[in-house]
Amino acid sequence: KLGSIVDIAKKYKEDGINPFPENIDVVTGGFPCQDFSIAGKRQGFQSKKTHQGLMAEAGTPSIESRGQLYMWMREVIAITKPKVFIAENVKGLVNLGDVKEIIEDDFRNIGDGYLVVPAKVLHAGEFGVPQSRERVIFIGFRRDSLKKEAIRELSKDRINNIYDPYPKETHYLPNAQPEFFKTEFVSVRKALQGLGEPEDSDDPAHQAYSKAKFMGRHCQGQIEVDLDGLAPTIRAEHHGNIEVSR
């Protein structure tokens, strides 16, 4: 059932009926990024927007504010008790005061305790995605689902490659020094070649294009994509006026 995670978790607390399936192994989620992104006002935990995206009537932050919705993902993890959880957000969260450390600690204190490895920023382009997209990833393991050796290794400051839960980069980025065990980045041209022409499709969505004006290099609005490089970050709201010339 779709709905606000706040409303779903609150209803569970009120009537005790678990809305989630049993025996969940993995919970994944991306809590709202607007209050952490360098493209926004960066209000972080002090966001005055509600979980519905509206201005709070009192005008003050609360546990239901948009900037604190990771706490409700935390509630879902506490309810479902998955063996593993993965959360993601924008890179800007990392350098917004001690926000990253606070979120890591809050995730560690779920129920009987989760082992949360240090969050890490991953670049999509280093994994063969033709897009310049960086996201910070949080990973946590339910302690009773791990062997003692795994707990010991995952608790170290420098985790051995065998136990490191983060994937290894497979591609090197544009302008980076080529590496023997990595493949060249996937360019926009390589990803799009072979696609049919928009006018050959019966889907109106394939023929629509933006008429917005170029807004300068300070943002990605109406910029022309470098076909031999990586595309800018594709945004979740499906706009941003990114132009690919044919």
Task: Name each model-derived stretch.
Residues I8-I24, Q34, I38-L227:
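Class I S-adenosyl-L-methionine
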Residues K1-V6:
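SAM cofactor-binding core of SAM-dependent methyltransferases
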Residues F31:
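Glycine-rich, N-terminal phosphate-binding loop of Rossmann-like dinucleotide-binding domains
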Residues F214-R246:
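Internal helical hairpin/lid segments
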